[in-house]
A protein has these predicted regions:
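Long, low-complexity, charge-biased intrinsically disordered regions
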Residues: 3-407
């Protein structure tokens, strides 16, 4: 029996005519439907998704080919509903846009958000503006926004552990659109958004953005400034050494875009601060992530003796090992007394490069993030692999065996 996606359009008919488009498109992908019928219905969904450790982002058309497209569509509906309910844009006739004003495209990005063990946490749909179509001096100026340094994160987590401080994480929902837009920006209707249900012609209308959507060049700066002003108004001072660390008498806050870590010795300081955000004039919308167990893909766990903690990135290591093509169940790992900083290069390194079916530069990027975040012992081999402009797969395979053995 063929599987079809069925969902009820919301937003006063905003997506009414799109339902048929989605159903027709998904039904045309017979193989995807067969996978959904024969696999997902016979296995627990978590058994399949835990095996597929993908971290790919999908476009609108690619999302429709996925066996769990129905879950992505629900996330898309929620994303659109959140934007409309918070007046992030205004639908206006195309003729009302200033003469000669360039409208930018809207882009959907879909991704499966996972727990550290690989299970799916949620299906994420993100509506972005095509910032590459903006014009400097017309609809944007300054764009730079700082991000927290991992040195600050590690240092403050160590301090929190030593002093037995309270830690808590919060995640701002639709963070960028919570910031005002200083100049008007006009955007085409996103894929899946149709006005036919309202008796209007979609081609005759555009969106006038009221807030800083994701993708806009100035979006990150506008959001950072809004959050910074809110923290300063609550008695926090920006750290001299790191502009994303804010300090008050009772609390320290680490800010990484829309993810924050709250650290305090006072048991009531964190709840009081969260309440002030909920009731404040900024109208912040966020979720309380509870105690800090995972942050930015890095898992933290206290040592059994209670005198320290470990930081690990198991999902990233999985991606590196699988990208090279190793089977984690059968590949021989390396776990010996030779330090990871031991040089990997030898006299044959200048020989012809070996061909491989994986992206060498992508792996270098992942290794760079891994060694800079939780595995400083990999700095030397990562540096040596990165110094080569051509693929030397024997180096990468040797390093991956080390990763597999020191999981």
């Amino acid at each position: 029996m063929a599987t079809t996606l069925q969902w009820t359009p919301t937003l006063n008919g905003l997506y009414s005519s799109t339902e048929n488009l989605v159903l027709a498109t998904v039904n045309s992908y017979h193989s995807a439907n067969q996978l959904f019928d024969n696999t997902l219905n016979s296995l627990h969904p978590m058994a399949l998704v835990a095996e597929k450790q993908d971290n790919e982002a999908y476009t609108f058309k690619e999302m429709l080919r996925q066996p769990d497209a129905a879950d992505f569509i629900q996330a898309m509906m929620k994303e659109a509903s959140d934007h409309e309910s918070r007046d992030h844009w205004t639908v206006i006739p195309r003729s009302k846009a200033p003469l000669g004003e360039k409208t930018i495209l809207a882009i959907w990005a879909f991704k499966r958000k996972r727990f550290p063990d690989g299970r799916i946490n949620k299906w994420k749909a993100r509506l972005c503006a095509h910032g590459g179509m903006q014009t400097y001096g017309v609809n944007y100026w300054d764009t730079y926004a700082p991000t927290v340094n991992w040195i600050s994160i590690r240092f403050l987590l160590v301090v929190a552990q030593i002093l037995d401080l309270n830690t808590q994480a919060i995640d701002f929902v639709l963070a960028f659109p919570q910031a005002d837009l200083e100049v008007p920006v006009y955007m085409e209707l996103p894929a899946g958004m149709d006005l036919e249900g309202r008796g209007l012609s979609s081609s005759s209308y555009v969106l006038k953005l009221n807030k800083s959507l994701y993708g806009l060049k100035q979006g990150s700066l506008n959001w950072h400034n809004k959050l910074k002003d809110a923290l300063i108004n609550r008695g926090f001072v920006e750290s001299i050494s790191d502009p994303c660390v804010f300090i008050s008498k009772k609390m320290i806050i680490l800010v990484y875009v829309d993810d924050c870590i709250l650290i305090s010795k006072d048991d009531i300081a964190i709840p009081a601060f969260i309440k002030s955000l909920e009731e404040g004039p900024e109208n912040f919308v966020f979720t309380d992530e509870g105690s800090l167990e995972s942050y930015l893909g890095v898992s933290t766990e206290k040592c059994p003796d209670g005198k320290g903690f470990t930081m690990s990135q198991p999902l990233l290591i999985d991606r590196i090992i699988k990208a090279i093509g190793f089977d984690m169940a059968t590949t021989k790992s390396v776990r010996d007394n030779v330090p990871a900083c031991y040089p990997l290069l030898n006299k044959d390194v200048d020989g012809p490069a070996k061909k491989a079916n994986w992206k060498y530069r992508s792996l270098i990027g992942m290794l760079g993030y891994l060694q800079g975040t939780s595995r400083p012992d990999l700095s030397m081999p990562t540096h040596q692999c990165a110094s080569l402009t051509m693929t030397q797969n024997f180096l990468m395979r040797g390093l991956s065996r080390k990763l597999l053995g020191t999981y």
